[in-house]
């Protein structure tokens, strides 16, 4: 069974990465690790250089309740040079952010739109992103 695991790292502490790595190191299926915290992605890659990791990102406001440092690092995407994510999952509602522009034109790694919940949102994103993360919705065009 393929797994997509989001590391919830609300501060600069990356201690949980070791525990997740220990739990997954013998897993035989495919697994993607993603997080809003680029420090956690970097730590996980140090533990498992073959892991596929993704940076969750978007433009943040105070209501997002994210640690201010983590919000800055994540939204700017500038630390991607250190964390080296294999993909970015970006909040398509805030893709006018400077960090998104930089990623598209400088880092050139695959970008997935999150989280798409309607047909209208799907139509908006389908040609602008490399992939789409859906929630409680699957477009009729791609149902097998």
Where are these regions (language model features)?
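Short loop-to-alpha-helix "cap/lid" segments that border enzyme active sites
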Residues: 1-3, 7-144
